[in-house]
Amino acid sequence: MPNEAPKSKILSYRRSHFVTRLPVGFLYSPSHCWLQRCNDEGLWRVGITKFASRMLGEMVDFGFELKPADPAKTGQIIGWLEGFKAISDVYCVVEGAFAGSNPALEKKIGFIDKDPYQKGWLYEATGEPDPKCMNVDDYVTVLDKTIDKILENQSADEIN
């Protein structure tokens, strides 16, 4: 099992003031997680997208409620992330078993912000991805709609 995800093709994305690079071969959840298949036995590495980390702000703490080999269901709260802007539950996006959290984050939680698609992964799980997960092109559509809604709300707040 690799310590870092292999280099993959990248899609450059820009909408309003948000710019990111999205690995093409990953799956993405509507809740702004990414999934990368690690092997043919159904091991998936999971992290949050640059968009999600930006919404939470600089990471300050995290924790997981499951131990390796514990069963995990899609949609189940398995942990939490705390950023300067917000605290968020971490939901499982793989139906199967929790394989463990990223040990590198214990020493450098900033990997979540600075290198979300390589060193900043959150956890690994074996099983099947949530059927709501999508390819990068479909995720771009989700990002567009999400950012447009944020901009719409900001405009409404400025008017009021």
Label the model's feature ranges.
Residues M1-I77, S88, A97-N160:
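Non-catalytic terminal segments and appended small domains
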Residues L81-G83:
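Flexible, gly/ser-rich surface segments that form the specificity/activation loops bordering the active-site cleft
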